[in-house]
Regions:
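Gly/Gly-Pro- and Ser/Thr-rich, intrinsically disordered tail segments characteristic of DNA damage-repair
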Residues: 1-283, 288, 292-318, 327-329
Length: 330
């Protein structure tokens, strides 16, 4: 079987970056949040710019959390201000770094989904300059998965070179930067992008590129917590795993559970071999408006063989939390 190489590319704080570029502001140094301020402060922020996240604000915060975090940061900042007083405010992280007398400020941009879709279409056209449409799987408005195997061989380049080439083209075309993950399967490429890339030092353009293979995944990801950081692992899934003493991917990998032919656990835990996701591409993507089928193997298929063999042997009803599970360590 041919060894394959996949790229996962995620546009950094996409909605916030689009709004910054529309205002001729640097997406990496401008404090901006995308939210409908006309609603209550409980409204969810669709995006938070990287410089604003630096104050401990999560990407999907509610607006009141942004207000609270910035207020707390300003209280600390005021202690170092000349005369303990602010002389102004700024939403630029560069200005704030150079002038301790300025209070932290931020911009609130109302969401414009149709506008973001237009930008996504434009960026997709950039991808098509480097990769054929059959090798691009559109995962979301700001994220794609790419089979890079044939391009690396044909052009005699590394996966990192190809990822950087694509990302820099997007940056030149739109002013928006991105993060990339590289792996021998889609799962590892996405985990490299979602988790490992956050620990990689960004370059001068804010680009982060991370690579994971099976051995590196064992070394770096088996002890990572929380489990909800992993692709397709939600709170409910995490809670069920913790109820039987599994807190990390390493814990899961060390358990061989149930008979090899037993599919009951996979179905109940939503770990079917294949998941077909039907999406409609917006105008301008590939050959126009048509329905396409994007296939994503779920965690049970993506995960390396040593973890993919995980099973659960249950003597009684698996839905009953009082039942005992037989854990077989391998």
């Amino acid at each position: 079987m041919t060894e394959r190489t996949y790229l996962a590319i995620d546009l950094k704080s996409f909605y916030a970056s689009v709004e910054c570029m529309e205002r001729s502001l640097d997406p990496m140094t401008t404090n901006l949040v995308v939210a409908d301020a006309s609603r209550t402060e409980k409204t969810i922020c669709l995006a938070v710019s990287p410089s604003l996240k630096a104050y401990g604000i999560p990407g999907r915060a509610r607006l009141f959390e942004v207000v609270q975090k910035v207020k707390e940061a300003n209280l600390k900042r005021q202690r170092n201000a000349p005369g303990y007083r602010f002389t102004g405010a700024s939403s630029s992280s560069v200005e704030l770094a150079n002038n301790p007398g300025l209070a932290i400020d931020y911009l609130i941009a109302p969401p414009r989904m149709a506008h973001y879709m237009e930008h996504s279409t434009r960026i997709y056209s950039v991808y098509l300059k480097h990769v054929a449409p059959d090798d691009i799987h559109v995962y979301s408005i700001d994220e794609v998965l790419i089979d890079a195997t044939s391009y690396l061989k044909r052009e005699n380049i590394t996966a990192k070179d190809l990822a950087m080439r694509i990302i820099l083209d997007v940056l030149r075309t739109t002013g928006i930067t991105a993060t990339a993950g590289i792996g021998p399967n889609l799962y590892l490429a996405k985990i490299a992008m979602d988790i490992y890339a956050k620990h990689v030092q960004p370059d001068e353009n804010g680009v982060r590129i991370a690579e994971l293979d099976e051995m590196k995944y064992r070394q770096l990801m088996w002890t990572h917590r929380p489990l909800t950081d992993f692709w397709r692992v939600g709170k409910g899934y995490e809670k069920k795993l913790e109820s039987i003493g599994l807190y990390t991917m390493g814990d899961i990998a060390r358990c061989s559970l149930g008979a090899p032919t037993d599919q009951d656990w996979r179905v109940k835990w939503n770990l079917q071999d294949v998941c077909y996701i039907h999406v409609r591409k917006p105008g301008g993507l590939a050959s126009g408006n048509h329905k396409v089928q994007v296939i994503f193997w779920e965690v049970a298929s993506y995960i390396p063989p040593f973890l993919d063999e995980m099973r659960m042997k249950q003597e009684d009803d698996p839905e009953d939390p009082s039942n005992t599970r037989e854990m077989i360590i391998v």
